[in-house]
Amino acid sequence: MRVLSLFDGIATGRLALEMAGVPVDLYIASEIDKDAKAVARANWPDMIHIGPVESVTAPDLPKIDLVIGGSPCQGFSRAGAGLNFNDPRSRLFFDYVRVLNEVRAKNPDVKFLLENVIMKREWEDVITEKLGVQPVHINSRAHSAQNRPRAYWSNIADLSPLSSGGGSRWTPSSTAAST
């Protein structure tokens, strides 16, 4: 699978794919934090870093099968000032959409997954409209010691939420092994 990870951080998306048994043939990452990139490179020296999301253009990329990412949440977080898309960091979501649409022009069957915080419904509705899919709300406590409610938007058809321990979890896809 050829993966483009926007807002990659320390490449936990790649780790999750590998833990799910999804073969990653190519992993291209957009990240600006130098320390996060150093951690990712130390673990996966074969990954390709392509700089900030604002400068990513799909015509410069090979065919991509999966676009993943979690755009900055500061404008949406209940812990923040509530600036929503007026926060320049949270506006980077629109770069995710731009890149995803450019990738779709090369591969109409591209799959995507976007993660963000639980936010006001009006802001969530904007993201839902731009991505064309409804979010699924999942609390990390279903899988870890953290209590972190999150919203996930995806067009991966064989993923569905299940109720579990006060949170939700994904069922493993038919092509991925559960670990």
Task: Tell where the protein language model's regions lie, with residue ranges.
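N-terminal start-of-chain detector that recognizes signal peptides
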Residues: 1-2, 21-22, 123-128
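Redox-cofactor binding/interface segments in oxidoreductases and associated redox assembly factors
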Residues: 51, 68-69
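Active-site glycine-rich loops that stabilize anionic/oxyanionic intermediates
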Residues: 10, 71-72
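Short glycine/serine/threonine-biased micro-segments
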Residues: 7, 67-68
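Residue-level recognition of the N-termini of beta-strands and the immediately preceding loop/turn
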Residues: 1, 25-27, 108-112
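SAM cofactor-binding core of SAM-dependent methyltransferases
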Residues: 3-57, 92
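Class I S-adenosyl-L-methionine
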Residues: 56-66, 73-179
